[in-house]
């Protein structure tokens, strides 16, 4: 994908990108971008089959761990929602990192190597995956695509004289409970497992923090005698921006050897850490992303990324950073694009074709 493309271009790509989620070991439940199996292209909509069997086969195609497969089979709408969640997560990850050296490369061998280490990038993958699943499930409930959940009734919010609860809110209560059970928790003695689980929860908490109450007025002549209100999730792009900020301020915890950075040593617990037995728990109470290892530079091709040689960059914005001081090539090309578009009655858009010359910058090898 081209760096610097508008968000709309990334969202349009969703029609052709649907990724397979996977689970790993019996002791752990992993999801989407954090699975070790290859991300495989699947149809977003299920093929027409006998209604009673279609979602069973879809869940089997996802190659889930036993518990996850059982949860998938409970509701005919889960399989399609899981696939949608992975697609959302992948697209948002690539959009948020489009100007970075690591541009959320999800090719199998790079992703597999990355997930074996506790980098900041790994933390982001866990958080964006759990956030994507939480968001997609809550929306699927309110859209009527699930059998075991419907709209959010918000029983914890007080009805007031001036307004009443109504509409169809996104069911965050159901989705967050489902996600925590779906992802599971590994042994608390395993620091890496606890770090991964912590980052999963950060994704869920960011979704919760973005919930807003939306209201619609009812009354004579535009008055607001009665308001109908419901809870609505923030657009997933806003969630992605929030998680990207958390990635940039991620906290390093624990004690580990950094093969990627060539360093080793004990790390002091971060601010706001939880007090475990003997005060030894390094994980923070606050919803911050945490990591164990220093990230590699991602400048050169290696185990964790294909490097930045040949990457497109923006001369005034990020060429110096992305190209790692190697400089960049400049290529001039002529492009033709629709321009001066007008809507004609009825009902089509008429555009002229405008030709212009533009310069493309790519990193030197």
Swiss-Prot record:
Signal peptide: 1-29
Disulfide bond sites: 93-104, 141-149, 151-168, 215-229, 217-224, 299-324, 313-319, 323-363, 339-354, 341-351, 346-347
Key words of the record: Developmental protein, Disulfide bond, Extracellular matrix, Glycoprotein, Lipoprotein, Secreted, Signal, Wnt signaling pathway
Region described as Disordered: 260-287
SMART domains xref list: WNT1
Top-level taxonomic group: Eukaryota
Post-translational modification: Palmitoleoylation is required for efficient binding to frizzled receptors. Depalmitoleoylation leads to Wnt signaling pathway inhibition.
Localization, UniProt: Secreted, Extracellular space, Extracellular matrix; Secreted
GO biological process, one term: cell fate commitment
Lipidation (O-palmitoleoyl serine): 221
Gene Ontology CC: one annotated term: extracellular space
GO MF, any single term: frizzled binding
Cross-referenced InterPro entries: Wnt, Wnt9a, Wnt_C, Wnt_CS
Function: Ligand for members of the frizzled family of seven transmembrane receptors. Functions in the canonical Wnt/beta-catenin signaling pathway. Required for normal timing of IHH expression during embryonic bone development, normal chondrocyte maturation and for normal bone mineralization during embryonic bone development. Plays a redundant role in maintaining joint integrity.
PANTHER family from the UniProt entry: PROTEIN WNT-9A, WNT RELATED
Family per record: Belongs to the Wnt family.
Name of the featured protein: Protein Wnt-9a
